[in-house]
Structures are given as structure tokens and as C-alpha cells.
């Protein structure tokens, strides 16, 4: 654990007059809680680097649940997120902080996270496709395996024009009833491909990921979502979060 690791800060808060408590996501150790001693002091060279969305190299150690940051280097400047992409980045940071256990390795998820924030930094339209792809990747890494391509009841490939009801721990079963737990075969194929060519498939992806993530998040509201509603225009909020 004393070697250098690629990492991102998910969240930070003051720990003392001169130190920070960091929640970081690392390539090799997963999510780790660190104390950055002296990082808040006026002479600290770390203060500017230990920010969300800045690619870092970290070295840390210690035996307890809270490790001690030994060294930190910024690999590059922070990825340029602002407005809706900033709130989207805060959202995925909060997701990781809420659902990942400490010190559980998720190397592939680390690169999914990196790809997501890079996509957000370069987005010119809605960030929702990038968010939905990351949520689906996260669910997969958590062991939430869902077959989007076949009916769980008959085993037959899904049909674009048919409707399927989602049942937890079983999958999608053909249904004649249409409600917020049903999806068309076309929507399921889009979820499987993680490609959302229109508003219909994008809305379906949001419905599914919200249902699937709910058991991991519990009833506690996401702070990033509340911040988004508070500071972004109502029309934007309705488009992206409702």
C-alpha cells in the first residue's frame, strides 16, 4: 500500500485546523479514507491538488481504517467541469462514496470512472448518456447482473415491439401491463448496448438505473441531486433529473 497509486478525490472536509479528511478512489485499493496532515496550512503545496476531478498519484499507509497520506502529485490539471457537468461529476462521486465499501479493489471501475469524467469534460450536449453508462458499469461491478437480451420467463430473445416487466433477481419477463417497471424490447437492447439514440431509450435507461441503484442507496437523498435542484434552472433540472 506504500507504493504510488492513481487516484481521484471523491470528497474532502476539514479534519483539524491544518489537516483534511479525504475520501479517495484509487486504482489498486478502491475507496480509501485518508488524513492529509498539514494540507490546510498556508504553506501546503497539496491544497490545490487535493480537489475532485484532478488526476493524482498518491502514496499512503497505516494500519487502521483511516490511512495517512504520505505524498501526492497532480498528474494534470483538474478536468474542466462546470455547470451541469460539474453537478454530474459530483453525482458520480457521491454514488461511489455511498455504494463502495472501503479498501475493496475495483480496478476496472476506476477506468470506467476516469472515462466518465473525461466524457463529461468534453460533452457539448446532455451529460445523461455518460451518466447512464457509468451507472450500468457500476451495477455490473457490484455484481448486479441483468440479462437485457432474453426473456427470463421463456428464454427467448426480446422482441422490439413487446413489453417486459423487470423483476428483481429474475430479470425481464414478458408482460401485457405497462407501468414504470416495464420496458420495450427496443429499450432493453439499448440498455444492453449502452447506446441511447433518442429520448425514449435515455428515459428508459434512467428509470432502470434508478430502480437498480435504490437498494444500494437506501432512502437517504443524494446531496448532489439536491444541490442541482437548488442552483440550476428549473427547466434544466426537469430535463436531467426528473
Swiss-Prot record:
InterPro entries: ARFGAP/RecO (IPR037278), DNA_rep/recomb_RecO_N (IPR022572), NA-bd_OB-fold (IPR012340), RecO (IPR003717), RecO_C (IPR042242). Disruption phenotype: No visible phenotype. The keyword RNA-binding does not apply. GO terms for biological process: DNA recombination; double-strand break repair; recombinational repair; response to UV. Keywords: DNA damage, DNA recombination, DNA repair. Belongs to the RecO family. Involved in DNA repair and RecF pathway recombination. Monomer. This is DNA repair protein RecO. It comes from Escherichia coli (strain K12). The lineage of its organism: Bacteria, Pseudomonadati, Pseudomonadota, Gammaproteobacteria, Enterobacterales.
